[in-house]
Amino acid sequence: MRRLTLVPILFLALALPSGAQGAVALTALDQYVVAHGYGGAQFILHQNAYRLPIIANGKAGDLTIDTGAPTSVIFRATLKKFGLSQEGTDMAVHGAFGKGSEKLGLTSVHQLAMGNCTLMNVKAVVVSDPDSGGVYRMYGLSDGLFGLREMLKYGAVLDISNHLLMVHPGGQMKGISGGIRAILTKQGYTPVDLTITGGHLHVPAVVNGVSCRLLVDTGASLTVLDRQFARKARLGGYDTGQYARGIGTKARPIRVSQFPELKVGDFSIRNAAVTISDLDPDLLGGDGKASAVGLLGAEYLGLHGAVFDFNSGTLYLRPQKS
């Protein structure tokens, strides 16, 4: 079985306040997608994490929407709640900061309902997380992660600006991507091509004038760059005295750096601020052209109203609203 690297990162003491809202009105984009047979659910923003309410095998819970996780995850502490069993493997847990000693488990959720849509026989890996426990637990993560494999399989449209995850139970609908592009570019969005490398989403980027690639990770609270690349890009910064924690490994110290411009594709973010830490070389992909140098996290995706179209492999970003 191949290595599986799970990338959610919790930035201890740096998380932003929660943001919940009532039922949302569908935007022109959402109405267009729903008209093509999509269903889905509203999620909430909690400490810079996108928390999706679900019902798994008849039991209520929530999953963190995580484009950085190649597959969906159920945390070991919630197996009993959902009436799930697990099969053991010899594969060690890999997180953003390296490999841990724990072994992954495998499970399958017979029915996973989200809003007005039900997915059948959703396969997931099982890992431990001491802070799990759903539903919208005030501290820690949720019952698991809704991962990239399911978003690709069901042609998800993830509308972060309007807090909606929409999926098509019959699979991808590539025919709707032209309409999505027309709606969003008219609204001032910039499209950025996504590529999949090693089970992770990558985007081209420029950090402080240095071209690179970033892994797009809604499960990372903040954008983080690897320390070695930060030196190459001549990023300064200061120690925060704070730590970031990933799945399977101990927390790592982080620095904060500011620089004039971060470009994601053709989209420009002025006066960017990022965190810097030592990331796992296996996650980044080594020294090849396809390697990444860090994670594009939830804070910039949220500030710029990100929309993901997993049918065409496109990320849309717009200027920050004043």
Model region roles, listed by residue range:
Residues 20-322:
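Pepsin/retropepsin-fold aspartyl endopeptidases
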Residues 7-15:
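Bacterial N-terminal signal peptides
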